[in-house]
Regions:
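N-terminal polybasic/positive-inside topogenic patches
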Residues: 192, 212-216
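A structural signal for small-residue-enriched, beta-sheet-centric alpha/beta enzyme cores
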Residues: 2-78, 82-92, 103-127, 131-175, ...
Length: 477
């Protein structure tokens, strides 16, 4: 039977070791607004990324795909201008931005990634950005204010900054082995001590005090060795802790075929580049790819993970217990950020969570849940607090994920209670007023049991309100 791996994590407001952030006002689109951010690590980082699947991609995406194979020291993010559909000049502006930042940081520009978000089609205001870079670098810090400034600087129509961090503990097989070894050594030590006493008794009976003294010296020596080992173990135990922190932006144009948004995950864990990329790719499909606000996939989407190894753990280079723990930590951070983005959907009044369980496969569960939260008819029903479950079934039906429509159960739930709506594929009589009350909560859950397997998945979205139209109609003004 496989051992259940549990994540030991505590909420943390501190950045991972070795990272610094900053955010300044460069007046890129608006005056007196934070719009340029920096992520920096003095130690070189292993990096991994996932990128938009939109065939029209911003200049920064091409830049990053070319640089991500290198060790990364810095990421510079601007808001207010997407630098998409900007041609050769847009590409040159990326190069100029990276070179200018590299000069101030005194590193090679190949170690720098870039990200942009904002209006498509406009060129970056390079004089303003170049002027702001020295200040951006000078203000980099690891304190709470730097987190606040950087997370605000990457926002566009977001109503709040989105960050989340945790401190975790690794539990590698080596640690378990050391515990077992320690126990065995203790037994052996007791046996040796017992033998030593017998030796002392025998030698005393022979009036051989020198042998007794020799045995006592050996025991003292072993005690000193034990104390030294214990001290080393304590040091190693401290090195098992690592931090992981995430910062994201996203409110509109959210329907990922990757992660429709900007996401930056920082960690001080030591891990190989190959496993870092594999972990991000896997977790991304379960988190950022499972959110939707409006069905639009951006030209600038990206999620990047940087790992600088400052935690000084033994490098994770195989799919060990430590790797599984890291994946759980990464997922915890990504789920939190994904839910924050869905909650902050433009004009949203409800966070919508769809949970599919007992599916035939993970793919089936993910596809069905994503289809439901992506349905505009479902979104508007939630906005109107209308328990129109037929729209949910309709979305499931056109999702291209086959399922047995005669088996599933459907429940609406929130902090105000829960109510069964469908049983074995057939609608049940329910109290409309109770359903309306449940759907009036700020977080609404649609729970679907397919009763056809063992797999599960979740997706997150929001309702579609009148304000969504107003916000996007006025976006360029």
């Amino acid at each position: 039977m496989a051992t259940q791996i549990k994540l030991k994590a505590k909420r943390s407001t501190k950045l991972p070791k070795g990272f610094k952030l900053s955010g300044v006002k460069a007046n890129i689109k608006y005056k007196n607004r934070l719009d340029l951010a920096l992520i920096y690590s003095q130690e070189p980082c292993q990096s991994a990324g996932v990128w938009t699947k939109n065939s029209v991609q911003a200049a920064c995406i091409a830049h990053n795909k070319a640089k991500i194979q290198n060790h990364i020291h810095a990421v510079m993010i601007n808001s207010g201008c997407a630098n998409a559909c900007t041609g050769k000049q847009g590409e040159e502006n990326c190069d100029k931005s990276a070179e200018a930042l590299a000069k101030v940081l005194r590193i090679d520009s190949k170690h720098i990634l870039l990200a942009s978000t904002g209006v498509i089609g406009a060129q970056l205001p390079m004089p303003r950005i170049l002027k702001a870079i020295p200040k951006l670098v000078a203000q980099k810090n690891s304190n709470k204010d730097s987190i606040k400034l950087a997370s605000k600087a990457i926002m566009t129509t977001d109503t709040f900054p989105k960050t989340f961090g945790i401190t975790c503990k690794l539990q590698s097989p080596n640690d378990l082995d050391s515990k077992n070894t320690s126990g065995k050594e203790k037994v052996a030590r007791n046996e040796k001590t017992s033998d030593s006493k017998n030796i002392v008794i025998n030698t005393e009976s022979k009036e051989n005090a020198k042998d007794s003294t020799s045995v006592e010296n050996k025991l003292d020596s072993k005690t000193q060795e034990k104390e030294t080992c214990d001290k080393k173990a304590k040091v190693e135990k401290k090195n098992n802790k690592f931090r992981i922190f995430g910062m994201a932006k996203g409110s509109g144009m959210i329907h990922p075929n990757m992660a429709t948004m900007l996401g930056f995950i920082l960690t001080d864990i030591a891990i190989s580049k190959e496993l870092l990329q594999e972990a991000l790719s896997e977790i991304n499909t379960q988190t950022f790819n499972q959110i939707s606000v409006d069905g639009d996939t951006s030209t600038n989407d990206m999620v990047v993970v940087l790992a600088n190894g400052a935690a000084k753990n033994e490098i994770i280079s195989s799919k060990s217990t430590d790797y599984e723990i890291f994946k759980k930590a990464l997922k915890k951070v990504c789920v939190n950020l994904a839910k924050q983005i869905a909650k902050d959907g433009e004009g949203a009044t409800h966070l919508l969570e769809v949970s599919i369980k007992n599916a035939q496969s993970l793919q089936q569960a993910q596809t069905l849940s994503k289809a439901i939260i992506g349905s505009n008819l479902v979104k508007t029903a939630i906005f109107g607090k209308d328990a129109n479950w037929g729209r949910i079934i309709c979305a499931m039906g056109y999702s291209n994920a086959s399922f047995d429509a005669s088996k599933f159960n459907l429940i609406f739930a929130s902090k105000k209670g829960k109510i069964a709506i469908v049983k074995n594929g057939v609608g049940t009589a329910f109290n409309e007023n109770k359903a309306k009350s449940i759907l009036s909560a700020d977080v609404v859950r649609i729970l679907i049991d397919l009763q056809d397997g063992t797999h599960s998945a979740k997706a997150w979205g929001c309702d579609l309100s009148y304000d969504y139209i107003k916000i996007n109609a006025d976006y360029r003004s």
